[in-house]
């Protein structure tokens, strides 16, 4: 009984010392746009991406508004009164303002989020921009969010411990590939029903993971033809060990059909080592396209299991 009472008291203290402190003193940090932001209140938070709503909730907070992927992709336990702002690329600004937020968590990579800055600032609403593609960027955001909520325990559990597990996997990968003559190589395809494009390693979740684990992304460096128009000639010249495909959008069946059509459109695809050796993988978009957040270690582990199977 004493333990239960202690837990309840600690929970109350966390709530009372979080944004209450921000109300009196403010909390200042630098966002992804290199702007100095001071948060005076975070009682009503709007997150412009489902992944950012996830981070805020992992930090012990609640949201009053967020994008539809918070429901569709992250399946967050949101109250019925949370405003659905629609798709993250075209959020409903009127609905956002009507939700009466005092703090908005936005993406520095989302043009619609950037365009709303002046409007929200003019209304006296604090807006901070974040950019998260790596575990360290996630940890940095978690630090800010848990400082605001006063939940250092969640920073340790959902931040520090997660990144520590990621580092263990990185160490295993470095030791593994140090014994090999050549590092494994991969072609990373981001596929929707309408288009399929190769992606480099910069600024996206899977690309950063591949580089982190020592995998050569054949679309990096001078291979612009692969990156810009998915040059089959360039892919054949590089002959990747793996092909990783990540779905964009919700129509998995249409994406698989588009990929099958691509591979069957030219028999040269079947000459690739990745295809001949059955090393073509459709990866979970929740782990490798969206931000995995507290599941970063799970994502790294799954990817390492695949690439370490290559003799």
What is the predicted role of each segment?
Residues 31-32, 82-94, 223-232:
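Short helix-initiation/N-cap motifs at beta->coil->alpha
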Residues 70-72, 197-227:
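Alpha-helical, coiled-coil/dimerization segments enriched in small aliphatic residues
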Residues 139-148, 153-156, 160, 242-311:
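Structured C-terminal subdomain patch of bacterial secreted/periplasmic proteins
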Residues 112-115, 128-144, 183-205:
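Extracytoplasmic ligand-binding site segments that recognize negatively charged/polar headgroups
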Residues 48-99, 103-110:
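A short, structured surface patch at a secondary-structure boundary
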Residues 7-15:
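Bacterial N-terminal signal peptides
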Residues 4-5, 19-51, 152-187, 247, ...:
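Bacterial Sec-exported substrate-binding components of ABC uptake systems
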Residues 93-106, 125, 232-245:
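Proline-aspartate-enriched helix->loop->beta-strand connector
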């Amino acid at each position: 009984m004493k333990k239960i009472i202690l837990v309840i008291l600690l929970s109350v203290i966390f709530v009372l010392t979080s944004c209450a402190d921000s109300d009196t003193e403010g909390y200042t940090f630098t966002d992804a746009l290199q702007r100095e932001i001071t948060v005076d209140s975070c009682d009503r938070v709007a997150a412009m991406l489902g992944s950012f709503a996830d981070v805020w909730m992992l930090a012990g907070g609640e949201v009053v508004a967020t994008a539809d992927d918070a429901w569709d992709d992250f399946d967050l336990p949101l109250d019925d009164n949370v405003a659905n702002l629609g798709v993250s690329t075209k959020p409903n600004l009127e609905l956002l303002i009507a939700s009466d937020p005092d703090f908005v968590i936005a993406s520095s990579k989302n043009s619609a989020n950037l365009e709303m800055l002046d409007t929200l600032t003019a209304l006296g609403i604090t807006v901070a921009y974040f950019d998260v593609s790596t575990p360290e960027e996630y940890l940095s955001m978690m630090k800010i969010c848990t400082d605001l909520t006063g939940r250092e325990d969640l920073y340790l559990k959902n931040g520090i411990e997660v990144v520590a597990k990621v580092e263990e996997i990185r160490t295993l990968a470095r030791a593994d590939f140090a014994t090999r003559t050549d590092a494994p190589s991969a072609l990373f395809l981001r596929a929707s029903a309408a288009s399929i494009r190769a992606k480099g390693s910069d600024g996206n979740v899977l690309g950063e993971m591949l580089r982190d684990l020592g995998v050569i992304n054949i679309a990096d460096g001078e291979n612009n033809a692969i990156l810009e128009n998915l040059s089959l000639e360039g892919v054949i010249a590089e002959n990747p060990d793996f092909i990783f495909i990540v779905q964009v959008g919700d129509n998995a069946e249409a994406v698989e059909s588009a990929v099958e059509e691509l591979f069957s459109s030219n028999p040269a695809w079947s000459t690739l080592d990745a295809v001949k050796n059955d090393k073509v993988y459709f990866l979970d978009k929740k782990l490798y396209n969206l931000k995995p957040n507290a599941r970063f270690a799970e994502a790294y582990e799954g990817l390492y299991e695949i690439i370490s199977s290559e003799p």
